[in-house]
């Protein structure tokens, strides 16, 4: 899969600046992914986000989108605004839907998914062989579906 042009990923407050594109490795079940800095329009880095392209069992639990905002920039909906831009990139890859997941105790991330009108599918137990369970001792994920 090729990396698409991402220069359109901006609005009147933020822009997503491509950090890396990972082509994926299907032999180990890794899908292609984009990693971005979330920046203001002067390109000051305020956080990071990523978009994973495609579908597999792991993405149901891990999600297609991940994000983090530096503490001094929190409270301005920058993660939600970045997600809306990533939705547009996902559409360019002909994705019809995607998942965003959050830990049940991560109230901020769950609020972002609700703010974005994601369909709450429920709280799911991670499979025993899931990397997040093995490496991070996580056991459950709130899973939200977004139809694009």
Positions of PLM-derived features:
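Acetyl-CoA-dependent GNAT
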Residues: 4-60
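Short hydrophobic/aromatic beta-strand or adjacent loop that forms the aromatic wall/cage
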Residues: 33-35, 137-143
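Conserved beta-strand segments that form the floor/walls of ligand-binding pockets within enzyme
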Residues: 37, 50, 64, 68, ...
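Residue-level signal for glycine
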Residues: 43-45, 82, 118
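Conserved acetyl-CoA-binding loop-helix of GNAT-fold acetyltransferases
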Residues: 67-69, 75-88, 111-115
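Conserved GNAT acetyl-CoA-binding A-motif
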Residues: 91-101
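Conserved catalytic-core motifs of GNAT/GCN5-like acyltransferases
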Residues: 101, 119-136
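Conserved active-site alpha-helix within GNAT-family acetyltransferase domains
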Residues: 105-122
